[in-house]
Swiss-Prot record:
A biological process from GO: glucosamine catabolic process
Organism whose genome encodes this protein: Colwellia psychrerythraea (strain 34H / ATCC BAA-681)
EC number(s) from the headed UniProt entry: 3.5.99.6
Protein name: Glucosamine-6-phosphate deaminase
Quaternary structure (record): Homohexamer.
Pfam families attached to this UniProt entry: Glucosamine_iso
Any one Gene Ontology molecular-function term assigned to this protein's record: glucosamine-6-phosphate deaminase activity
Gene designation: nagB
Length: 268
């Protein structure tokens, strides 16, 4: 796991955008795994800026989102399809027919939808770079604590903590879903590269458990310890409970030298 600590959240977004841009510019048909929530919004803004500046094109890119609320219409402003359209897809040249979410409408079988989503990812050649955030309880996607480390795309019941964390996004009289479709932990680990972004003091405990805690389903993000190419981008607040800050800074300086000479990716 490569841990990189930045002074602030904006620097996290800028570095994450460099990872995405290099992949898109290096690979003819890149496949991105995308996330929602507050953390990646600044990343998407950086990518939109790069597109408008002529630094990259999404025309050959395929994307798969981590999750989507169960039974919510894609046109609903609380849907993750709406989120992605508003924050990225509407502002770049990506073909929306090649942007996928694990949508499961009312009356559809969530188990069949999960299998179908896994098939679509496989048919696209797998995910090259999966973007992640992390919940305060260590969840990635909607893989809540005690999720199986071997799990695949499926329906999940959201914990009360996740519901509380997300309640600020819903009006008091607005329906808030308690179920969601999500890529599984094994699905995430299948990505060739994983890039997790975490900012703010509220994520510090989960970050510590992910990076230095035991591998455990209690902290789903700790599964990234098993990934060959996991990159963790943190601001100082999110990294505040990690020990050995000096080591992470020193290691990053060594990696910067290698990346400058050979690029961020070793197999593209």
């Amino acid at each position: 796991m490569q841990v990189i600590i930045f002074d602030n959240a904006q620097q996290v977004a800028e570095n994450a955008a460099e990872w995405v841009a290099e992949l898109i510019n290096k690979k003819s048909n890149p496949v991105l795994g995308l996330a929602t929530g507050s953390t990646p919004i600044s990343l998407y803004q950086e990518l939109v800026n790069k597109y408008k500046a002529g630094e990259l094109s999404f025309s050959n890119t395929t994307s798969f989102n981590l999750d989507e609320y169960l039974g919510i219409n894609e046109k609903n402003q609380q849907s993750y399809r709406h989120f992605m359209n508003e924050n990225l897809f509407n502002h770049v040249d990506i073909n929306k027919l090649k942007t996928f979410l694990p949508t499961c409408n009312q009356g559809e079988n969530p188990r069949e939808q999960g299998l179908d989503y896994e098939d679509k990812i496989a048919q696209a050649g797998g995910i090259d770079l999966q973007i992640l955030g992390i919940g305060a309880n260590g969840h990635i996607g909607f893989n809540e604590p005690t999720s199986s480390l071997a799990s695949r795309t499926r329906i999940k019941t959201l914990t009360q903590q996740t519901l509380n964390d997300n309640s600020r996004l819903f009006a008091a009289d607005e329906f808030q879903p308690t179920l969601a479709m999500t890529m599984g932990i094994a699905t995430i680990l299948d990505a060739r590269y994983v890039l997790l972004m975490a900012t703010g003091k509220s994520k510090a405990k989960a970050v510590k458990e992910m990076v230095t805690g035991p591998l455990s389903a209690v902290c789903p993000a700790s599964s990234l310890q098993l990934h060959e190419n996991a990159i963790v981008l943190l601001d100082k607040e999110a990294a505040s409970e990690l020990e050995d800050h000096e080591y992470y800074v020193w290691a990053d300086k060594q990696n910067v030298k290698i990346n400058q000479e050979f690029g961020l990716y070793h197999n593209y």
